[in-house]
Amino acid sequence: MKLKTTLGLLAGRSSHFILSRLGRGSTLPGKLALQFDKDILQHLAKNYEIVVVTGTNGKTLTTALTVGILKEIYGQVLTNPSGANMITGITTTFLAAKSSKTGKNIAVLEIDEASLSRICDYIQPSLFVITNIFRDQMDRYGEIYTTYNMILDAIRKVPTATVLLNGDSPLFYKPSIPNPVQYFGFDLEKGPAQLAHYNTEGILCPECQSILKYELNTYANLGAYICENCGCKRPELDYRLTELVELTNNRSRFVIDGQEYGIQIGGLYNIYNALAAVAIARFLGAEPQLIKQGFDKSRAVFGRQETFHIGDKECTLVLIKNPVGATQAIEMIKLAPYPFSLSVLLNANYADGIDTSWIWDADFEQITDMDIPEINAGGVRHSEIARRLRVTGYPSDKITETSSLEQVLKTIENQDCKHAYILATYTAMLEFRELLANRQIVRKEMN
């Protein structure tokens, strides 16, 4: 082993040991190790079978559900549970790894789309999974085709890896890669071909660029698409969801390839994440019973429908970061059978995306159909989100705004309503969780 690698391992593992004893999570160990040896990740990851999960929405939950299943088989699975998905975070994850008791080293990693190509210079995944690609942080990623090409460039570096794609996305039709490809998707009852919502991106035929129609449109640009001009249509699915048995704001049940599964997480969009997890598990040889056991133990993860109590109020924290994700979160809370207060926390830091114009493309108009007695607009850009909420027609006198997340917390604590939803952009979610953790309402880290 090279001296620089030895020094990098010493610096990284020592700092991780100290930080863990202090109860602090950080990507500092990875950053320190990489300063000694920029290739250290290659050394750390060389004996692992690696599954990479990437895409715009659903990475964290898909990864968590997959890890839950694989733990039923291997007992121990390396992962990055708090969503530290850039190279310093991935390196930190491997530095913290413990020896496998089964002799099988397996890692399931969510990786940021823009970081994937760089990371794939140092790791050799056996499976890539792309959940979806939607418009997200335009100032960082650019438009959807730019993001997709970044991911494909990374995948081409590992031509032996299988690629598991959301077959319901037209973007993923016949990707220009040498890798073997498999698809998962919804195979529910189809109807007459119709256009998607007028504000939907990524609906051009991948063959002739005509506007696609959908015989089944689950949400956004996903579903059983067909081109009436050239006949292009969704590819055959290798893993098929054939029935929605139950769908609520906090759980769902569904049938995939003849087996019924359930998760204690609400919303249609999260069923796609469960479908991806099933597809990964089946690809790796997991039997349906073990998948069910993994799902039965699954719970919401780090800011993604994470539930807790503020006083006697049952609260749910939901990450939002782009128009499609926010709209699906709103669709999910709309399923709640009880009144609830709503807090929407908008920041505009680098990790959130500095351009906040995306809030105008999210379907906040649905809140006027819900039993919401009061709304808190919070975060650095509280005035912008307050303005967006007023435009929906929701009564202005029921909207309060503040830059102080501490004040948002106090408002929830003092409200009459017994339920609360908090929709927050990434750094606002982290800041709000830190407030909660300091009060010992939630744990600082979710492992």
Sequence positions of predicted segments:
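ATP-dependent carboxylate-amine ligase
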Residues: M1-S15, L19, R24-S26, G202, ...
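Adenine nucleotide phosphate-binding catalytic loops in nucleotide-utilizing enzymes
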Residues: G185-P323
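Residue-level signal for inorganic ion chemistry
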Residues: E110, T131, L164, N273, ...
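Residues at the starts of beta-strands that form the adenosine-phosphate
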Residues: Q76, S126-L127, A161-T162, P180, ...
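Short glycine-/acidic-enriched loop or helix-start segments at secondary-structure transitions
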Residues: T62-T63, R118-I119, D139-R140, Y173-S176, ...
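Phosphate-binding loop of NTP-binding sites
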Residues: K2-L204
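Buried hydrophobic packing segments
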Residues: T66, L70, I90-F94, A274-L284, ...
